[in-house]
UniProtKB/Swiss-Prot annotation:
The keyword Transport applies. It is found in: Host nucleus, Host nucleolus; Host cytoplasm. This is Protein Rev. InterPro entries: Rev_lentivir. A motif (Nuclear export signal) lies at residues 106-115. One of its GO terms (biological process) is mRNA transport. A motif (Nuclear localization signal and RNA-binding (RRE)) lies at residues 75-92.
């Protein structure tokens, strides 16, 4: 305990010295000037009713689309302006190959053709199926039933019967 009390609680260095009188006077003068300027500005505001710059009636170009008043996000960054600008930028950036001139040759575009087996398939020929639209219901049910029966053989259905031995 005695050793702790002998040491000062806080050491001071040269950098921590209080400011000289001259510099302190300068600080005070700047403070007074700043306060006077603020008072003059407040009196100079429209009709003298507003207390600060942020409350001004006329804030320069706030009616313009680009700004939303003092300290706010620009309107360009808000909502649908942002979306619209992105959309326009996208349209400008679409390369010309995506707007091909239909009368000229489309360079780089290959003719897409179906394989011959697919072309011969009746599904791809709409004329063959126009009169024969409805499939026979019994045929469909038989096909469906066989698929259902196959499913019933395995899976959870066997487990369910063993889960409740009393029933």
């Amino acid at each position: 305990m005695a050793s702790k009390e002998s040491k000062p609680s806080r050491t001071t260095r040269r950098g921590m010295e209080p400011p000289l009188r001259e510099t302190w006077n300068q600080v005070l003068q700047e403070l007074v000037k700043r306060q006077q300027q603020e008072e003059e500005e407040q009196q100079g505001l429209v009709s003298g009713l507003q207390a600060s710059k942020a409350d001004q009636i006329y804030t320069g170009n706030s009616g313009d689309r680009s700004t939303g008043g003092i300290g706010g996000k620009t309107k360009k960054k808000r909502g649908w302006y942002k979306w619209l600008r992105k959309l326009r930028a996208r349209e400008k950036n679409i390369p010309s190959q995506f707007y091909p001139d239909m009368e000229s040759n489309m360079v780089g575009m290959e003719n897409l053709t179906l394989e011959t087996q697919l072309e011969d398939n009746a599904l791809y020929n709409p004329a063959t199926y126009i009169g024969d639209m409805a499939m026979d219901g019994r045929e469909w049910m038989e096909w469906r039933e066989s698929a259902q029966k196959e499913k019933r053989k395995g899976g959870l259905s066997g487990q369910r019967t063993n889960a409740y031995p009393g029933k």
